[in-house]
């Protein structure tokens, strides 16, 4: 078992998901402040992706920007996931609390957020023929976050 700062626990969970989420559970660590900050960064990443993606790769360019759909797609969907996961875990004898599900789920989104920012930067540098790199980075972030989410839910509910 390790002694980490709250940010250290986040890095430990992202880079060592099997061990990290189990250690997080047994040490009763995890910061609600950091998880809310991650959800805020998720919203910011979606806004940046929508507005700042290079014009060659941006299919959603509009003159009027509406933030409400992005709030729904990031913050509302996240809390719907947390609440739904908690409701199902109570029916299936999971051990996760609402707070732990929120923390673990937010920690799992970090690779997606980071890869979204990297893809936006690359979209402003690369040409259309090199779009495979942007797609690969996006799929890497999604896949890594899905793996982390599965491991996190397995650890938090003890399935």
How does the language model describe each region?
Residues 28, 50-62, 90-94, 124-129, ...:
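Transmembrane helix-loop junctions in multipass membrane proteins, especially transporters and channels
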Residues 3, 68-73, 130-137:
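Short alpha-helical transmembrane interface motifs in multi-pass membrane proteins
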Residues 124-159:
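Terminal transmembrane helical module of multi-pass membrane proteins
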Residues 58-123:
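Alpha-helical transmembrane segments with an aromatic anchor "belt"
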Residues 1-49, 53:
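N-terminal juxtamembrane cytosolic/stromal segments of multi-pass membrane proteins
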Residues 44-55, 117-125, 147-154:
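Structural signature of transmembrane alpha-helix termini at the membrane-water interface
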Residues 33, 37, 103-107, 132-142:
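Alpha-helical transmembrane segments of integral membrane proteins
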Residues 22-32, 92-100, 154-159:
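Membrane-interface helix-boundary motifs at transmembrane edges
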